[in-house]
Amino acid sequence: MSEEFQESEVIFSDESFTRKDNKISHNNENYERKSTEKDKISSPVRIPSRTTIRYTEEEGEMTPPHVIIEKRRTEAQMAFSFCTLKGRDLSRHRNTVLRMTGFLEV
């Protein structure tokens, strides 16, 4: 007659704990030294915040993530120029903007 075992008896048997405990106690010094070397080498993991993920729902449909990212990127951009204006050029551009917005009359 064969003996039936419970799953916990096979996986969590007392022998496996004693074997692991013996290995750890014998190699305790080597284990600690390896962990400190590994800590120095490894870099921290960046975990993104959950608040940055936002989905907009229109008529029950979900917006694809690439569309959301594109919207964020374009909304965050400002108009800028690569060249810096100085002196007379800066005055001309300032006056042009003020005329276009109605703050300066022609």
UniProtKB/Swiss-Prot annotation:
Induction: Induced by dark, abscisic acid (ABA) and salicylic acid (SA). Triggered by pathogen attack such as Pseudomonas syringae pv. Tomato DC3000.
Recorded superkingdom: Eukaryota
Record's keyword annotation contains Nucleus: yes
Key words, A-Z: Nucleus, Plant defense
InterPro entries: Senescence_reg_S40 (IPR007608)
Region Disordered, residue ranges: 1-65
GO terms for cellular component: nucleus
Regions of compositional bias (Basic and acidic residues) in chain numbering: 16-41
Localization per Swiss-Prot or TrEMBL: Nucleus
Loss of function: phenotype: The s40-3a mutant, with low but constitutive S40-3 levels, exhibits a staygreen phenotype and delayed senescence associated with a reduced expression of WRKY53, SEN1 and SAG12 genes, especially at later stages of development. Reduced cyst nematodes female/male sex ratio.
Presence of the UniProt keyword Zinc in the record: no
GO BP term, pick one: regulation of nematode larval development
Function field: Regulates senescence either by modulating WRKY53 or by activating SAG12. Affects the natural variation of cyst nematodes sex ratio and susceptibility to parasitic nematodes, depending on single nucleotide polymorphism (SNPs) between cultivars.
Protein family: Belongs to the senescence regulator S40 family.
Protein name (database record): Protein S40-3
